[in-house]
Amino acid sequence: MTLHAYLGRAGTGKSTKMLTEIKQKMKADPLGDPIILIAPTQSTFQLEQAFVNDPELNGSLRTEVLHFERLSHRIFQEVGSYSEQKLSKAATEMMIYNIVQEQQKYLKLYQSQAKYYGFSEKLTEQIQDFKKYAVTPEHLESFIADKNMQTRTKNKLEDIALIYREFEQRIQNEFITGEDALQYFIDCMPKSEWLKRADIYIDGFHNFSTIEYLIIKGLIKYAKSVTIILTTDGNHDQFSLFRKPSEVLRHIEEISNELNISIERQYFNQLYRFNNQDLKHLEQEFDALQINRVACQGHINILESATMREEINEIARRIIVDIRDKQLRYQDIAILYRDESYAYLFDSILPLYNIPYNIDTKRSMTHHPVMEMIRSLIEVIQSNWQINPMLRLLKTDVLTTSYLKSAYLVDLLENFVLERGIYGKRWLDDELFNVEHFSKMGRKAHKLTEDERNTFEQVVKLKKDVIDKILHFEKQMSQAATVKDFATAFYESMEYFELPNQLMTERDELDLNGNHEKAEEIDQIWNGLIQILDDLVLVFGDEPMSMERFLEVFDIGLEQLEFVMIPQTLDQVSIGTMDLAKVDNKQHVYLVGMNDGTMPQPVTASSLITDEEKKYFEQQANVELSPTSDILQMDEAFVCYVAMTRAKGNVTFSYSLMGSSGDDKEISPFLNQIQSLFNQLEITNIPQYHEVNPLSLMQHAKQTKITLFEALRAWLDDEIVADSWLDAYQVIRDSDHLSQGLDYLMSALTFDNETVKLGETLSKDLYGKEINASVSRFEGYQQCPFKHYASHGLKLNERTKYELQNFDLGDIFHSVLKYISERINGDFKQLDLKKIRQLTNEALEEILPKVQFNLLNSSAYYRYLSRRIGAIVETTLSALKYQGTYSKFMPKHFETSFRRKPRTNDELIAQTLTTTQGIPINIRGQIDRIDTYTKNDTSFVNIIDYKSSEGSATLDLTKVYYGMQMQMMTYMDIVLQNKQRLGLTDIVKPGGLLYFHVHEPRIKFKSWADIDEDKLEQDLIKKFKLSGLVNADQTVIDALDIRLEPKFTSDIVPVGLNKDGSLSKRGSQVADEATIYKFIQHNKENFIETASNIMDGHTEVAPLKYKQKLPCAFCSYQSVCHVDGMIDSKRYRTVDETINPIEAIQNININDEFGGEQ
């Protein structure tokens, strides 16, 4: 047995010497003693290719490239393997999770964390870490017993030891872990005659675990020879660049001393890898204490980009240049990264440039539709059919592929179930999914067309099919008692879903279309699913388990599944992480994401045991554990060194100034260090570079068109653009091959976010030959013409959800107050507390079940909200009683509707107006309350409007003047026109236009001592004071509040008197009768103007800004109009807010008879 060590810095020919040595032995004796090359898992494929592709060898029966685990299997084939079943990573995790749940009550520190999936994962990692470093439960238990330590640390180690011990007992004589298998491999080494004849080479490693050192020790002891290759200069200084591999060398020296074998060291000092002085100087001087600066010859570049996306786009362009102009092949190029955010960018950007690549990393299967379907199916059962997992299940499209346009059907179903609040076993109620119910989707019911009916029938059929499958799954699972039963039931359910056939069909189609990677994913998904089921049966077998626990454990297993993709072609760019990727002797290596915080990367302890606890354990127990954070931090420079010395021709470093979440980023200090080694190594700012060299952006036809679009956009905005872009446009335009898609891009150049004025015919087609509308529709137009166009022209509707909206609350209050008012004939004065509560309960029992499909009885929260609504109504009735006590006006009519042609005698007639185009305007609506007071054959009327929002319970006369608030004047106009239908006298005059705010008032107190219950009740009632505008006629003033006297301000209406008996300006909101009539007539003119603009086809995105507020804040159509408050201020309309509206209206010359009796 001999031991060799090839030592040297990167690129000095160590691996080449090894490969040459192996090659010579193979040529000399192709069937001689075995030669074993041990390498990291991610390097084995590359090394195998090197032997296969060597024209002098064309493969070999003598040499094998193996990692430690595969080597153990090779020995087991010879001497016999263990009898126990080997646990996969997923099986180990599932077993530990189940143990944690069973032992939860015995845990001291982690009892509350035990229920979380992530805890068992951390615990599994910790146990595997202990196994790698040969730490047993006995080690932990004896250490805890012998040492005094902090209570938290002791409790932590006791918890871990408890689970570790239980795990070891469960697997004893029945199962074996990967780490235990390696220990068994060590025990088998002396029996292997094959190993005794073998020459062993170990290359590509920079550190080993304790169990791996024990394997190396066995190889040295029993193999014919062992040669280990290490990237180190032999310096054992713990602060040396080569600390990590030198630590390996120190361990090997200890092993050799223990075995009494000398190490034959061979030092490699001559640099062979690098083709130029730049890379040689970079390697030699990176860790130099005294810098020797030389001129850079252009083989090293540092790129600075604004964003990560721009960074990868630039790398892609430079790869195209490498291939096209420098005659490289894709396989000559590698990209190394460290920030995981780049993996997504590679997948999204490199295909746009048609660059073949392979990312050497495992991807989780979690987000694949099949896995999402299975996990959603599990959650549906666990959550008792809650809506979110159900919708996720449906949207995977795995169970609905047989339906044409299944995604559209699922969208319709989602709209319906969100509106109806379908959850739990309501999914099974066929009556809820009657096709006729779909006609009520949204706010207005309509008769279904034949196409709509057919579509909704398909929706119902799709729902039934999926429900049948879920019910079958639930039934099968509910009948199971043991883990084996559950696994069998699950597999049979998948067969009932026809999932195997479906997946195999999909795989074959993908293969036929050349999408082999996606086809491979399908295979791995199915095989992974079967493996988890097999693991469950293997680990738990006939062990009884609840369905809930089984589904939890099963989900844990699914979490562990990962795609392991082999390269789809040989000629492709290799992409990997700087820490793990094994790329050697590439012509060009790109190191992306070279930012501070990534390289070097702050290393923080993520295991259950902290760094301090590790150090204490190592010192006191005399064992070695995985490196602590501070040790790993010291090795960051070595990681950078290894990554940048993989190239033999060129190295390009790149970094961005902004992270994936928009955060600022700094350049890596290693780049500053590298830059200091050269005289002419400047950082290239990518945007500035392209500005000077626009042709550098024109590397790929498709991407050049996109960049051309940006350049032409700048040119149209009168910015200076290089002539080469105009030349590029002409070349692309004149080429049949290149011009594809150019017309679409050019049309986008002239796109402006402006609407088009509708023609007369189209306006009539959209809005009809007469306008039948509520007041709020006209107010909406005044807020923004586009809002009106979107809602009433395009008829866009928001998705209705099963939740209480603000307008629902308003409707409830209106309905309840109408119900009670009619029961008492508007005589609120007669109410006492008992009567108020009785009537409130009656009204709520009658009305609440009709709201949103009985929404207010659907949950504890909504039932609580119902009680809150009841309390508000009771307080409101108390306020109405108080107001009625001191007012001569009597409520007479409630929720009175009006329209052009009344349907009943109780409805009022609305006068028809006409637009400038001759289009009739028919206004409809409903007046909450009409109060009347008659004196001397003259009737005065008050309009009372209930508002549940404080912001809308104010009459702003400026808004009235400009047509932004049209409701109250319209209502008063309608009442004045309908004196006969209302049973009023010949002379009818306006009294007040008043808002009543239905709310839950609050009063602030400085201390409890300030509270007087009687006064508190009075103060709360006063919070309901009416607001609006009152006729200044003395008769009206006297009737509104009988308590009015000099120096008194009413607490029920907006009227107050000075000490001389005149109306106070501060406490009164009044106008004379003529002014009110002028407001009414001006309001009509606003109707006509607004309706005329609508029929003229105005659809501008032009919100009206008033008092620094925009209607956009509460608009549902911003995603359609794309108005931006930061850049679209020129679109805003404004009005003169400084006017005195009463003076302004008085100055208008209006000739009108103020309507007439209809």
UniProtKB/Swiss-Prot annotation:
Gene3D superfamilies: 3.90.320.10, P-loop containing nucleotide triphosphate hydrolases
UniProt keyword Amino-acid biosynthesis, yes or no: no
GO biological process, one term: double-strand break repair via homologous recombination
Cofactor descriptive note: Binds 1 [4Fe-4S] cluster.
InterPro entries per the UniProt record, alphabetical: ADDB_N (IPR049035), DNA_helicase_suAddB (IPR014140), DNA_helicase_UvrD-like_C (IPR014017), P-loop_NTPase (IPR027417), PDDEXK-like_dom_sf (IPR011604), PDDEXK_AddAB-type (IPR038726)
Residues that coordinate or bind [4Fe-4S] cluster: 784, 1112, 1115, 1121
Molecular functions per Gene Ontology: 4 iron, 4 sulfur cluster binding; 5'-3' exonuclease activity; ATP binding; double-stranded DNA binding; helicase activity; metal ion binding
Domain UvrD-like helicase ATP-binding residues, every copy: 1-275
Residues reported to bind ATP: 8-15
Keyword Membrane annotated: no
The protein's assembly and partners: Heterodimer of AddA and AddB.
Family: Belongs to the helicase family. AddB/RexB type 1 subfamily.
HAMAP family: AddB_type1 (MF_01452)
Additional comment: Despite having conserved helicase domains, this subunit does not have helicase activity.
Protein name per Swiss-Prot or TrEMBL: ATP-dependent helicase/deoxyribonuclease subunit B
Species for this entry: Staphylococcus aureus (strain MRSA252)
